[in-house]
């Protein structure tokens, strides 16, 4: 069998790039939303926007957190088994 290290490296770089770029896009969009919320003049509108956007940001954060934890756990399990036959 041939070595798959080069393929794994390329795949890791591609996946890492996709994750970083998508995360940056999401963070930038949330920063712009927060900027606009903070510049609202109406207190009622401000609280309504914070309530709506806040819950959405929490859900998206949990989604990424659990995905990251799962990825790190699976990667560490894979590396732990490398020395075994």
Swiss-Prot record:
UniProt keyword terms in alphabetical order: Cell membrane, G-protein coupled receptor, Membrane, Olfaction, Receptor, Sensory transduction, Transducer, Transmembrane, Transmembrane helix
InterPro entries referenced in this protein's UniProt entry, alphabetically: Olfact_rcpt
Transmembrane regions listed in the UniProt entry: 13-33, 49-69
One Pfam match: 7tm_4
Main location: membrane
Cell compartment(s), UniProt: Cell membrane
Record has Metal-binding as a keyword: no
GO MF assignments: G protein-coupled receptor activity; olfactory receptor activity
Residue ranges, Cytoplasmic side: 1-12, 70-85
Membrane topology of this protein: Multi-pass membrane protein
Superkingdom in the source lineage: Eukaryota
Disulphide linkage map: none
Keyword Cytoplasm: no
Ranges of the Extracellular topological domain: 34-48
An example Gene Ontology CC term for this record: plasma membrane
Function as written in the Swiss-Prot or TrEMBL entry: Odorant receptor.
Family membership noted in the UniProt record: Belongs to the G-protein coupled receptor 1 family.
Protein name (database record): Olfactory receptor-like protein HbT9
Native source species: Apis mellifera ligustica (Common honeybee)
Biological classification of the source: Eukaryota, Metazoa, Ecdysozoa, Arthropoda, Hexapoda
């Amino acid at each position: 069998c041939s070595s798959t290290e080069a393929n794994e490296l390329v795949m890791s770089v591609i996946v890492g790039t996709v994750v970083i770029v998508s995360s940056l896009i999401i963070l930038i969009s949330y920063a712009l939303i927060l900027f606009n919320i903070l510049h609202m003049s109406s207190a009622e509108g401000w609280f309504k926007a914070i309530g709506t956007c806040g819950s959405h940001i929490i859900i998206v954060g949990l989604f990424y957190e659990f995905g990251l934890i799962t990825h790190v756990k699976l990667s560490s399990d894979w590396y732990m088994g490398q020395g075994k036959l």
